[in-house]
């Protein structure tokens, strides 16, 4: 039986930028501020290593429940179980609210 090649072996597509997005990401993303109770989307920014979450949670939507240092605590539901992730602002996007 072959080796697994590590815990991030099947996450290559999630950890690569599209050709148009390569290089330094916009600084506005890294300093964005989110309020408690705000809904946010989890999207990995491969250009920023700090504050990254495990790729298994990529694409989920969660709720900001607080801060820890410069990062945000985001609560997500993973298969019926609530989990709290510590995520940097560069990896979060605000969910658009319908008006």
From Swiss-Prot:
This is Large ribosomal subunit protein eL21. The gene is rpl21e. Keywords: Ribonucleoprotein, Ribosomal protein. The keyword Ribonucleoprotein applies. Residues 1-14 have a biased composition (Polar residues). One of its GO terms (cellular component) is ribonucleoprotein complex. GO terms for molecular function: structural constituent of ribosome. Transmembrane segments: none annotated. GO terms for biological process: translation. InterPro entries: Ribosomal_eL21, Ribosomal_eL21_arc, Ribosomal_eL21_CS, Ribosomal_eL21_sf, Translation_prot_SH3-like_sf. NCBIfam families: PRK04306.1. Residues 1-38 are annotated as: Disordered. Belongs to the eukaryotic ribosomal protein eL21 family. Gene3D superfamilies: Ribosomal protein L21. It holds the Pfam family Ribosomal_L21e.
């Amino acid at each position: 039986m072959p080796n697994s090649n590590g815990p991030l072996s099947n996450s290559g597509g999630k950890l690569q930028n599209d050709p148009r997005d390569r290089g330094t990401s916009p600084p506005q993303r890294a300093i964005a501020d989110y309020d408690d109770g705000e809904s946010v989307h989890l999207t990995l920014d491969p250009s920023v290593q700090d504050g990254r979450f495990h790729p298994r949670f990529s694409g989920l939507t969660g709720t900001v429940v607080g801060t820890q240092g410069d990062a945000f605590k985001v609560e997500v539901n993973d298969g019926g179980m609530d989990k709290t992730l510590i995520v940097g602002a560069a990896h979060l996007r605000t969910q658009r609210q319908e008006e």
